[in-house]
Every structure is written in structure tokens, then in C-alpha cells.
């Protein structure tokens, strides 16, 4: 329900509030909510295959938030995308930025989602079932990665999951 509110879904319950840094997100103007979602709150969605745009190169998708919020030029956003893809453990990020989502494995697509969520260095990262449909080894790698990046980016993490194995393993 909270995740639905943050992405702008109409399924959100409106008689309650979601307060973030002193602002009620349920009553904020759409532009303000969009800015907060893009700059201050990062979101890792459950299924990267359906969350990534199949017609856009990975580099454009990772850097999109920087361009939308006018934080960086196209060139700087591209460079930051390469840097962040490297930080999330992508091999050959200079090549990956020119690839499309269907060319990547599930674990690699999830790493792209993590890079997208962190591109604006948010103070809160919401990970909504970030390891669903991944094999156990990749699940652990993704959870370790989120934990490491949480420290590096000094961000809080909300892990949304029904997987008790992930909960017992994680240090988030």
C-alpha cells in the first residue's frame, strides 16, 4: 500500500498520511511528490523486466532521473550511470550502458534497478521484493549489495518482503 502511494497509484488510502521529512506525501502537489520520489526516495521494484523500458538503453534509463530533475547534463548523467553500474557490480559498464534490458540476466537487471534507485543519492531506499525470482546465490549477492550501498550512500532502507529466508539473512 505504501509502495503504491509512492509510485502515484490511485489505490492509495487517502484518509491516512505518509510523512517524509516533514511533508505529507498524500497531500503534496504531484510535482512535489514526483520530485521527492525522484530525488529523496529511491525504489527498487520487484520485477526489473517489467519495470525497465525495453526500448531504452540501460545508460539512458539509469541516468534518466538526473536529467528529469535537471541535476546533470546528458553527458554527466551518462558518466554517472557508468560509475554507478560499476558500483553495483556490473561487468564492463561501458558496454552495458548501450545494452537493452532483454540482453541482461535477471540478476544484472536487478543491479540496474538498484543503480536507478540510487542515482540521485536518496536518503531513503525502498526495496520491494528485490530478490523475487532470483536464484539463492543471486539473492544473497543482491542483499549484500544493498547492505554495502546503504552504508556507502548513507541511506536508510525499507525491505518489503515475504521471504523469511531473506529477512533472516539480511543486515538491512
Give residue spans per PLM region:
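Conserved ABC ATPase "signature" region
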Residues: 24, 76-95
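Hydrophobic anchor residue at the start of the ABC signature
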Residues: 62, 114, 125, 138, ...
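A short, proline-enriched helix->beta-strand linker immediately N-terminal to the Walker B motif
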Residues: 119-123
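Helical segment within the ABC ATPase nucleotide-binding domain
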Residues: 140-154
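ABC ATPase NBD coupling module
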Residues: 25-42, 68
Amino acid at each position: 500500500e505504501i509502495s503504491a502511494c509512492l509510485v502515484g497509484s490511485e489505490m492509495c488510502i487517502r484518509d491516512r498520511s505518509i510523512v517524509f521529512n516533514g511533508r505529507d506525501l498524500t497531500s503534496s502537489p504531484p510535482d512535489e511528490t514526483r520530485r521527492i520520489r525522484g530525488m529523496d526516495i529511491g525504489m527498487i521494484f520487484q520485477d526489473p523486466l517489467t519495470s525497465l523500458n525495453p526500448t531504452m538503453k540501460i545508460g539512458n534509463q539509469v541516468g534518466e532521473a538526473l536529467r528529469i530533475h535537471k541535476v546533470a547534463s546528458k553527458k554527466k548523467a551518462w558518466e554517472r550511470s557508468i560509475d554507478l553500474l560499476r558500483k553495483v557490480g556490473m561487468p564492463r559498464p561501458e558496454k552495458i550502458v548501450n545494452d537493452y534490458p532483454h540482453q541482461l540476466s535477471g540478476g544484472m537487471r536487478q543491479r540496474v534497478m538498484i543503480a536507478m534507485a540510487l542515482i540521485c543519492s536518496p536518503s531513503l531506499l525502498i526495496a520491494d521484493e528485490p530478490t523475487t525470482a532470483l536464484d539463492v546465490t543471486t539473492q544473497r549477492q543482491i542483499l549484500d549489495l544493498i547492505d554495502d550501498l546503504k552504508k556507502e550512500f548513507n541511506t536508510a532502507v525499507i525491505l518489503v518482503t515475504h521471504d523469511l529466508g531473506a529477512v533472516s539473512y539480511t543486515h538491512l
